[in-house]
């Protein structure tokens, strides 16, 4: 069995790690970097760029360069978070037939799992290049506050990338694994993981206990916001620059897609610089132009100004921290260590706010960019059976239930329940002689079902006629270790049962996933196709060159009709060579070979006559063979009848 790799599929950056014995290793990608930008670009010629190469060309190709696709994964187009992103993103967010948020690129609609699969494929390739063997299994991380639809969509992305996803693990839990495994402190420790990434925020309270030499990681509670992260911080800077530039120059950059892409790069760079310096210059020459000529942008941004721009965003992370502490049933003073995860936690103001809330300095010995991937790799080793000293007890982040009479949400499994878990409850019919019941499954904390996220629905039919409240229908909720829900309903009277794995009432169907898996395989076969096309084109061009040359020298010996046929075949092949159709090129090449056969025969006869006249009959055979070959006609060598050797003519003349 090959290694199970750990992948942190991030909003902004992704990372892959493996275990080598008892040591973890983060693997550098083909560019030598330990993290890869989660950016995918779709080129005009069909090529797909991933990572740094996609990021570099974003300014010139903003509409077809997709970043932060994770913010759309498992989401409906109508959700307010998606609607907010539509105005901000340079690419087009479209509504899929099933109501999901998809992305439109070069006239094609793509599902977010399909886009994320490109990043996962690069992570897979990075690991394979390092290990020198195929990789088929992975543990992939998700924000702890991801709902069922988002987890399922992430798993689908793994499948599309050719990976068997052994486990979906929560990012803060993975970071805790990475932190806790190499710590020698004895006794139980409670840690808070504050994870502020590119697009999502999570906080988890985790207890690390030593149980008979085994480290037990138990998640006590989790909370967060799946639409708050570094991208939002960047947007605050972009909005500020646009406003300042409009004040100074009277030009609104918000409608200029190219300018926006340059602003995004500049904002991200400025944000990073201000983590270590007090001020930075944002300098973008030729940002736009009007009737008076080109306009240049030069704005000074101080750390204090940045902090005032994003203060409210940082403040938004504190409420989930408060809730997580309360749900865990502990007080802030019970926390032993605070771990910071995600690139945004490098910002001094974020660290200051975390210290203020938890009353202690956050740990600095955890790499915020790599800890999550490392934890995923550790979990991979546990799942493969190579590690026996770790037990991970995770929780479901949101309550799960069904809609009952009056539109009420009846909770079956409450939030922060340790998973895997199973729960059954008996319900009955609301009307007399009701032949079927519809089970609608929701996720969320609101008392009214419709205010929560509808995950899916199914029917249990064939209930025998009976009075209201008589039939006994047992509904069972079963959450697996990935946090993915399976629901079944059974009529206790008849034994009839129906069940579903919740795949969101939309999501990708099995057929769509299979199609995307095939598309992904086709992508890998693309290079092979391109090579075959080049070879066919070379062969065709050689045939055109050879026959045209022979025609100019020996064409006068042909009848007008024969000459016209060859010239028409040359024209047809030249037209085919301008296209991308390999089969058409090969077909027209073969047609030209057949059409030029008469020319070959004439040259063969000429060569024989010339040889006889010179009294060199013995050598006529080889000479004729060369002549026929040079015309592209039917050569006597059967295995060569489709190959045109354009060099042969030069030998004959020489």
Curated annotation (Swiss-Prot):
The protein depicted here goes by the name Chaperone protein DnaK
- Point to the regions of Low complexity compositional bias: 610-637
Protein induction: By stress conditions e.g. heat shock.
What is this protein's function per UniProt? Acts as a chaperone.
Which family would the database say this protein is a member of? Answer: Belongs to the heat shock protein 70 family.
Chain positions with Phosphothreonine modification: 200
At the top level of its lineage, which domain of life is listed?
Bacteria
> Which gene does this sequence derive from?
dnaK
Q: Does the keyword ATP-binding apply?
A: yes
- Which pairs of positions does the record mark as disulfide bonds? none
Record keyword ATP-binding present: yes
Q: What terms describe the molecular function in GO for this protein?
A: ATP binding; ATP-dependent protein folding chaperone; unfolded protein binding
Q: Where is the composition biased (Basic and acidic residues)?
A: 638-654
**PANTHER family, per the entry:** HEAT SHOCK PROTEIN 70KDA
Q: Which UniProt keywords apply?
A: ATP-binding, Chaperone, Nucleotide-binding, Phosphoprotein, Stress response
Region Disordered, residue ranges: 610-654
Q: InterPro entries from the entry?
A: ATPase_NBD, Chaperone_DnaK, Heat_shock_70_CS, HSP70_C_sf, HSP70_peptide-bd_sf, Hsp_70_fam
